[in-house]
């Protein structure tokens, strides 16, 4: 492995122009679950997975994943943001679809190993890019009956990425959809599983085709309250209060959890509650938040079916609260701002 690393020293990447897409890297790490226990961590240079055509992940959706990032800081240190929360969330997602949870210590060991092995792909400080980390657990047993697999594979690969939205940190339009539901109130919406994203593809494609950044879902039961915002959580700002939906069909965002804490640190009130659609008209600022984009400020939200528009941004630009929250979170991730809550894990000094 050392010889391979020496031979692969030179990279010719325009870090500042990276898109949010897949780029091959040197190594991924894997761990198999067989006979009721997790095995040893293995390092692989292959991008392929040997898999039976009857594997449960292909037929019955036994698949859960995560997304987190490694950042090279101003001080040269490499930090991963809140990976303990990602370990908890993928464990919960796995258990939600009857898969064994990867132990938190093994999850952390694998993250550290895969980031270290692919150090040359960590974008430099100041480039605006980061190393995206994708953990994945899949059912591997060959079955044609609907039941949990007996064997599983947990793996992590990494790839350098640029901003999720080409516009970067800018206010963009969103649209409300009533034709589709992302997840049922007591379904898999709170788990990070592939089926939720498959269910959003048609609405997402229609929104993009119409010129919107993403689609907005209303609650599936009554179609009255704001729910998930594309593949991100929604929050609104008014009267010095950070307000985000309380729902049994929304993925609990680690970014949103962090922003709520930062809002409290800034002296704001935080509310998690139902947000009626008509309340959108009262927000001073609003955004969609998640690992990929951190915060995507909202310019306006269109409701095409009712021929109505909720204008959020007064000048088409991100508001002061969204901007401060974004800069603070990014500053913590990059080591520019004190990490008061001990969110960062130092991977390399």
What residues fall within each predicted segment?
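Intrinsically disordered, low-complexity linker/loop segments enriched in Gly/Pro
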Residues: 117, 139-140
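Short, charge-rich binding segments
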Residues: 120-126, 146-148
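Extended, Lys/Arg-enriched charged tracts that mediate electrostatic binding to polyanionic substrates
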Residues: 123-134, 138
């Amino acid at each position: 492995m050392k010889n391979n690393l020496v031979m692969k020293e030179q990279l010719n990447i325009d870090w500042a122009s990276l898109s949010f897409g897949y780029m091959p890297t040197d190594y991924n790490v894997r761990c198999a679950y067989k006979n009721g226990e997790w095995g040893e961590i293995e390092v692989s240079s292959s991008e392929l997975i040997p898999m039976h055509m009857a594997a449960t992940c292909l037929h019955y959706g036994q698949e859960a994943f995560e997304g987190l990032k490694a950042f090279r800081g101003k001080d040269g240190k490499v930090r991963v943001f809140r990976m303990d929360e990602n370990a908890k969330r993928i464990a919960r997602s796995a258990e939600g679809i009857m898969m064994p949870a990867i132990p938190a210590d093994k999850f952390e060991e694998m993250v550290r190993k895969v980031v270290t092995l692919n150090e040359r792909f960590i974008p430099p400080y100041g480039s605006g890019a980061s190393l995206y980390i994708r953990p994945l657990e899949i059912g591997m047993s060959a079955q044609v009956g609907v039941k949990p697999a007996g064997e599983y594979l947990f793996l992590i690969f990494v790839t350098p990425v640029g901003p999720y939205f080409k516009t970067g940190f800018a206010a963009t339009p969103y649209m409300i959809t009533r034709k589709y539901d992302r997840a049922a109130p007591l379904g898999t919406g709170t788990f990070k599983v592939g089926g939720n994203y498959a269910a959003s593809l048609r609405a997402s494609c229609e929104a993009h085709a119409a010129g919107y950044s993403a689609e907005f879902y209303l609650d599936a039961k009554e179609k009255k309250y704001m729910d998930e915002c594309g593949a991100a959580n929604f929050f609104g700002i008014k009267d010095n209060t950070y307000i985000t939906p309380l729902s049994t069909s929304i993925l609990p965002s680690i970014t949103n959890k962090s922003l709520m804490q930062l809002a409290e640190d800034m002296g704001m009130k935080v509310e998690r509650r139902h947000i009626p659609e008509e309340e959108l008209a009262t927000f001073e600022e609003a955004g969609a938040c998640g690992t990929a984009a951190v915060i995507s400020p909202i310019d306006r939200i269109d409701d095409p079916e009712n021929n109505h528009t909720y204008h959020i941004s007064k000048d088409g630009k991100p508001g002061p609260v969204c901007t401060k929250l974004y800069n603070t979170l990014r500053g913590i991730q990059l080591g520019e701002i004190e990490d008061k809550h001990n969110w960062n894990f130092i991977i390399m000094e």
